[in-house]
UniProtKB/Swiss-Prot annotation:
Name by which UniProt lists this protein: Glutamate--tRNA ligase
Function: Catalyzes the attachment of glutamate to tRNA(Glu) in a two-step reaction: glutamate is first activated by ATP to form Glu-AMP and then transferred to the acceptor end of tRNA(Glu).
Family: Belongs to the class-I aminoacyl-tRNA synthetase family. Glutamate--tRNA ligase type 1 subfamily.
Binding site for ATP: K243
A GO molecular-function descriptor: glutamate-tRNA ligase activity
Annotated localization: Cytoplasm
Gene: gltX
Enzyme class: ligase
Catalytic activity: tRNA(Glu) + L-glutamate + ATP = L-glutamyl-tRNA(Glu) + AMP + diphosphate
Length: 474
């Protein structure tokens, strides 16, 4: 009987949840969902100097924001150190590991000799077969794996295919340090085994680790999980991903106004494809995703594509959801608290009314917020330079006349104000644009905005007449 699929996402809490880690988490989550399995979350916090509680919280927060839920409790690797040492004791008893008393000077000499001779295997087996009675007094040994000296170590990888290493190039790696703390290589194997992990899906920078970890699995007589090493993410020019290219934390994308569903959709297409389809619902992603469809070549990050996808999802979102998302993003942006202070039942209703026009232009929530600035602006309205250039004496005089015409409108709506302005334009030999642009400048402080009659309706009669008065001349 086939075992249920168990994947795991195992970040190190030394910083934020970066974009590559987020994609790894997504691929693990998708594969678990597709197969009816589970995705577990393990925090690999054995590096006590670099692991921090804020980083752990940032990882958990990023996962929750991306809506990548995990099954069961979070496992903390450091808390399992006693179990890791227990496994090493069984390996020592079985002759699969040995105590190494080599000094730092001896190890340095081995490295230099290996480098000079062009060997990748640097440890020369100094203590591999020596009698323990020869151990120097007062020296705490490391524990090393008694790795095979000949033959091959082979990984049948779901993405990379068959990968072969010659065993004479692989060291007797350290399992326990002299202070008794387990190494990453050992801890990962023990934890994956004990957690019942069936599929290890991670970046291909871990491919060499797969060979070393397989040797530990073999020494313990444990079944190796299915391996899938996914390509790294590069910048648009093919170079290593940098902050300039998008190597940012998930929290930064939230603060830039991206939607979780858009980021998930973008990340799933970095290295994985399903024909020419670009836009996937979560359900479609789960149904279509499979490990062999992941390519081997590094994926290239493209901000323009991400923005385009985000704009699509903004346009597809219902208006009330967008008002809620706008309010949520204020917690993560500069001056967000000042903007939040202006939100009340009236301004929320205005945002909701304006949303159909606002969302057609916006590619991010920040652009949406910027477009909605006229709703939340205080009088006298700040006027941007392009709009200021249009506020000539002639235009200010026209604004005064437009205000007078609008003041006569009693039942205020987009339709009634449009009718009044069309009548004014016709009576004065003007095109509608010659009326709309002065109104736009006076009411929004910009030369672009949602439809001007929608703006009039959203702001309401009193606010519109007051803003027009601010810019008008007699």
């Amino acid at each position: 009987m086939t075992r249920p699929v168990v994947t795991r996402f195992a970040p190190s809490p030394t910083g934020f949840l970066h974009i590559g880690g987020a994609r790894t988490a997504l691929f693990n989550w998708l594969y678990a969902k597709k197969t009816g399995g589970k995705m577990l979350l393990r925090i690999e916090d054995t590096d006590r100097e670099r692991s921090t509680q804020p980083a752990i919280e940032a990882i958990l927060d990023g996962m929750k924001w991306l809506e990548l839920g995990w099954d069961g409790d979070v496992v903390y690797q450091f808390s399992r150190a006693a179990r890791h040492r227990e496994v090493v004791e069984t390996m020592l008893a079985a002759g699969a590991a040995y105590r190494c008393y080599a000094s730092a000077e001896e190890l340095t000499q081995m490295r230099e000799s290996a480098k000079a001779e062009g060997r990748t295997r640097f440890y020369n087996g100094l203590w591999r077969d020596r009698d323990p009675s020869e151990a120097p007094e007062g020296v705490k040994p490391t524990i090393r794996l008694k790795a095979p000296l000949t033959g091959e170590t082979v990984i049948e990888d779901q993405v990379q295919g068959r990968v072969v290493w010659q065993n004479d190039n692989l060291d007797d790696l350290v399992l326990l340090r002299g202070d008794g703390t387990p190494t990453y290589m050992l801890a990962v194997v023990v934890d994956d085994h004990d957690m019942g992990v069936t599929h290890v899906i991670r970046g291909d920078d871990h491919l060499i680790n797969a060979a070393r970890q397989k040797q530990i699995y073999d020494a313990l007589g444990w079944e190796l999980p299915t391996m899938a090493h996914i390509p790294l993410i590069h910048g648009p020019d093919g170079s290593k991903l940098s902050k300039r290219h998008g190597a940012l934390g998930v929290d930064a994308y939230r603060a830039m106004g991206y939607l979780p569903i858009a980021l998930r959709n973008y990340l799933v297409r970095l290295g994985w494809g399903h024909g020419d389809q670009e836009i996937f619902s979560t359900k479609e992603m789960i149904e279509a995703f499979d490990l062999p469809a992941i390519g081997r070549s590094a994926a290239r990050f493209d901000f323009a594509k991400l923005e385009s996808l985000n704009g699509h999802y903004i346009r597809q979102s219902d208006d009330q959801t967008l008002v809620t998302l706008l309010e949520d993003v204020l917690r993560y942006i500069p001056h967000g608290a000042q903007i939040a202070a202006k939100l009340n039942d009236t301004t929320r209703a205005q945002l909701l009314r304006a949303m159909p026009g606002l969302k057609e232009r916006a590619k991010t929530l920040l652009e949406l917020l910027d477009g909605a600035g006229f709703i939340l602006a205080d009088r006298p309205l700040p006027i941007d330079p392009k709009a200021q250039a249009l506020l000539t004496a002639e235009t200010r005089h026209l604004i005064g006349r437009l205000r007078a015409a609008l003041e006569a409108v009693t039942s205020w709506s987009a339709e009634t104000t449009e009718a009044a302005m069309r009548a004014f334009a016709e009576a004065n030999g003007l095109k509608l644009g010659g009326v709309a642009q002065p109104l736009r400048v006076a009411l929004t402080g910009r030369t672009t905005s949602p439809g001007i009659f929608d703006v009039l309706a959203v702001l309401g009669r009193d606010e519109c007449l007051a803003r027009l008065a601010d810019q008008a001349s007699e």
